[in-house]
Amino acid sequence: MANNKSAKKRIKVAERNRLVNKSYKSTVKTLTKKTLANCEKYKLDPNSDNKNLVMFSLSEAFSLIDKAVKKNVLHKNNGANKKSKINKLVKNFLTSK
């Protein structure tokens, strides 16, 4: 257990940061799943509305990943890998008929 004031403060700050980071990571996972669900929807009914929905959710996911990297929640390589993986899956869905 921490004995001095600065150590106690660091514990509080670390816990606060952990919760914020957890929130970012959870939201990234949610938006990734949402994007893939929209891809499935597009695959079943390929029309321009569904394609726009896929592109919008993809841009939302990319934006949040970039923000997480900027705030050091994710490492830049990890963020790039996540974006690449999502983009590869979306590209496969959009090109396969």
Swiss-Prot record:
GO terms for cellular component: small ribosomal subunit. One of its GO terms (biological process) is translation. GO terms for molecular function: small ribosomal subunit rRNA binding; structural constituent of ribosome. The keyword rRNA-binding applies. It holds the Pfam family Ribosomal_S20p. This is Small ribosomal subunit protein bS20. Keywords: Ribonucleoprotein, Ribosomal protein, RNA-binding, rRNA-binding. The gene is rpsT. The keyword Metal-binding does not apply. It comes from Prochlorococcus marinus (strain MIT 9515). Belongs to the bacterial ribosomal protein bS20 family. Binds directly to 16S ribosomal RNA. InterPro entries: Ribosomal_bS20, Ribosomal_bS20_sf.
